[in-house]
Amino acid sequence: MSQTVQVVFPCTEGQGAGLVAALKSALVETRAFEGCESVEVYTDADAPDRVVLWEKFAERANHEAYMAWRTETGLLEMLAPILTGELQITYFTDHPDI
């Protein structure tokens, strides 16, 4: 069963739109990463500097490998100056029978 993941980017004031623009090119690589099934980008309607990704990966291990790769390539470090804190990553269990 696929792994659903929510990743929240808590951006500093005024940086949400810039992050969304940067994600347009960065997510090309994400979507090509092994096990990635989909990625959707949202901004909080009441707090536009809170950017949320809803991702589906074949398995949690695929997402963990992806996050390790993003760390190794320096992307997360590059984003640090526009974030107010660490990424918030939540793994969800699907209940397709409900």
Where are these regions (language model features)?
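Short, surface-exposed ligand-recognition loops at beta-strand->loop->(often short) alpha-helix junctions
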Residues: 10-19
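A general secondary-structure junction signal
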Residues: 43, 91-93
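Short, flexible segments with low predicted structural confidence
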Residues: 1-3, 18, 34-36
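A short acidic, often aromatic-flanked loop/helix-cap motif at beta-alpha or helix-coil junctions
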Residues: 95-98
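An amphipathic, aromatic/His-enriched active-site/gating alpha helix that lines ligand/cofactor pockets
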Residues: 25-37, 56-89
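Short, well-ordered beta-strand segments in beta-rich or mixed alpha/beta enzyme
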Residues: 3-9, 40-67
